[in-house]
Amino acid sequence: MSDRIYHSYVNNFYQKAKSPKNTQLIKQIQRSNPTSPKKNLQIYKNINPFNHENCQRIIEENAIRFSDKKTVQLGTVYGCNILLTTKNSQPKVFEKLIQLSDNSNFRQVTLLKSISPVSVVKAKDFLNDSISNRSRSAQKMYSDKDKFQVGNNKSSLRSLIYFPLANIKDQISEESKSKRNKIKVIKDMPIQLDNSFQTINHQINSPNNNIVGDQSHVILHNIFKKRQQAEEGLQIQEEPQNYIKNKLELQERKMYLENQNPKSLSPIKIHFNEKSMPFKNKIQKKITYNEQSSIQQTITLIKKKILGPPSLYSRLKKNSEQFKNIENLIKNKAKESHEQNMQEYLKRIGCTDKNKKVFCINSQDQFVQEVLIELGWIENKLFKSDLFHLKWIYTDINKDYENLKEGQFYNHFQNNQELTNKGRLLRNIKLYLVSYPHLQKYFPIQFDVIYKQQKEEFLNEFQKFEIFRKFKDVIQIIKNDLTQELINQLTQIYHTKFIKKEEEEELQYGLITYFRQNQQFKQYIEYINQVNKDIINLLSKIPNPNINEMLIKYLNDLSILQVDKLECDQEQGDKNIQAQIINLSISIELDNILEQIYPYTNFCNFWIIKPCGSSKGQGLQIMSDDNQIVNYTTQLQARLVQKYIERIYICKSQEYPQLYNKKFDLRLWVLVKSFNPLTVYYYKHAYLRVCSSEYDLSDTRNIFSHFTNYSINRNKFIQNKNVEDSAISLKLLKHIIKKEHGISYQKKIQPQINEIIIHSLKSVQKKIKQNNSCFEIYGFDIIFDEQFNPYLLEVNLSPACSKRNEFISKLQKEMFISTLNILFNTEYYQIQNWKKIKIQDQIQKVINESTHTQLQEEVILNSNNFQSEDSEERFISAAITIQKWYRQIKLMKNENQKI
């Protein structure tokens, strides 16, 4: 397709984009049945090139039409806008999308033919997640000039993937239409000296970047389309002051070039406008980088341009100390320029006090604005301005991090979604636990079922808990009928059998007499035998059953018991009862082991389903049927499946009506001042989030008794006129634990919570970009089991909740004042409630406890497959071998008897 035809097509596309005919066009698409890509192009060319906002608007306007799940699905995938229509709904929507994203060849879009539309409510979630999951392989698709229509014409699916376009009249220059095909970068878009194809691609694929924007067409048309002409070089025309504007960026460019492979960089040619050159004529007018030139030579040329003529640069290079001093002067000059700009701003608004602080805010946290104004700060209402000392934004964008200077503070870190997004946090935690598996005790079992492997792992885990549930039911009945003395004797038999035969027979004598008198136990024993066989068979079929080492001894003993049982089958009487007693003793021991391994569950097999990108309790469900869970997570955007903490701590004392028989969790504020080195504080005065109804595990549909989110319980609290009970001070829980159970919260529980905080942050430390001007406050949600063991539920972004009662309002203001005292080294109101966590002590403790080597970690990470330990596989193969051996012995005995 020639440039002329392409631009005429784009002009026609854009002129009709804003016409209010979207609904009619969609109807036309539904009625049509195109037979060729060319005809498809004629139908689709008038559709608005949806950006993020337009997509949501059209979904809302056509909510009634889309709710029947048979018509249209809208979304944005891999930098393209996509509209899918199909006659027949088919399952596994998101699984197909993931297969597509993992595939290096983007042209295999025919996989989309099996995708079915989803409801309106979940179309928004699909849109949000798809923007943040774009693949680099999209550039291969863009390099193909002629493929605007991708799909299978023979199927009922009619899909279109097209370029996101912008207003060409304002952006496309005359030079871009010429035959030379040079790239003219618009002046409004800053291009840095180290800009390459990868850098521009990263800008386009940024999660916070609107694909349909002022620069998107120029970038896609002039860079992606001409990627095949890379050998001719990308020619960038730009005025020098745009990239020499901030000399502090020299170090960043140097680090970028040093870390890149020369062959992976596109050729870059930088042309200077000779008339606007601030340097002398002796300096070269052109910097050229190609694959033959080394990285160091390029860095040298860059430094020559910034530091001056070659003679001056060579003298500075010889004296390294003087060179470092100049770099320090550059930093100091940048700091001075920021302070000068702030003083000029204060003078411009009529403020005579040069020490006044300025803040920008665009957030729902009203307490921030109230506290700063009370402290005498001045608000810059242009929250996108660079003139501030503190910027407080609800959600960040990548552009906010570009021009941060020393002395400024911004309340987010770049890539914080790695910690606050439920799906990304799960992946990071799992990778981290590969090196430190003993930390699994702080994180409930959880799976992202959108991935095929994790979906299979979830089903295996569900089956394992289901068979354990059946076992617990029957063993509980037996325990209720047995006295504690008999249970102790059975436990003693388990620990002494196969060691001292005389003592074992002596212990069994009383039990044999008891079993003879109670014939009902024969039914219990038969049921236990069947359950034990089911356990062995189930675990032998599961590839990675994730068996704890404590279970290995039990299951091997159970297999060995089958030899005695086979021998006793030939002889009735006491020997048979003796084998049954041993079997029962092993089963009781298994019950004790399960209590230790899974202290947070009573094996009801409840699982909680969570959407990845939602907040405020949206989309939460509790289910106990594996088929129902799989169907729910496949059709909707609820991807995460987490084991429900069933045996939580519930206050049973009526002295404390705020917590009596109600579920609660802990919301703990955590301040991260730096990720490298890791500097972390936790807020001492945390609070409890309490449910509005009493806890009842038999009724999982009552959301008011199982979810502590205030957005869920708000109306219930208002109706009951007890909003004050929605959030309670942690001091009350400390008092209850100390008085009722004799446990010190500060000595037993707080150290474990510190471990959860540190290792959660360590799991994402390499993925979050460090910036000395950034800080962030996270909300860690933690729940306790009956033994007061803490578990991390999730980590929240911007966790300072809205006003609900006086206690929370006071807590928010004190927390924020304490934050200001740490950031600006002040002493406002003498308040400091942040307590620093000793990082090195926690890390060293984990290293000492870890048994994994660095080599094992690398092997597992490279395979990207979380396998179980080798001991489990050896156990399963051994158990199967023992069972085969039993059968052979039995056959041999039967044959000998016949002879």
Curated annotation (Swiss-Prot):
The keyword Magnesium does not apply. Disruption phenotype: Cells lacking TTLL3A, TTLL3B, TTLL3C, TTLL3D, TTLL3E and TTLL3F display shortened axonemes that are resistant to paclitaxel, indicating that tubulin glycylation changes the lattice properties of axonemal microtubules. Axonemes are however normal at the ultrastructural level. Keywords: ATP-binding, Cell projection, Cilium, Cytoplasm, Cytoskeleton, Ligase, Nucleotide-binding. It is found in: Cytoplasm, Cytoskeleton, Cilium basal body. Its EC number is 6.3.2.-. The keyword Ligase applies. GO terms for biological process: protein polyglycylation. GO terms for molecular function: ATP binding; protein-glycine ligase activity; protein-glycine ligase activity, initiating. The lineage of its organism: Eukaryota, Sar, Alveolata, Ciliophora, Intramacronucleata. Residues 471-835 form the TTL domain. Probable glycylase which modifies tubulin, generating side chains of glycine on the gamma-carboxyl groups of specific glutamate residues within the C-terminal tail of tubulin. The gene is TTLL3F. It holds the Pfam family TTL. Its main location: cytoplasm. GO terms for cellular component: cilium; cytoplasm; microtubule cytoskeleton. This is Tubulin glycylase 3F. It comes from Tetrahymena thermophila (strain SB210).
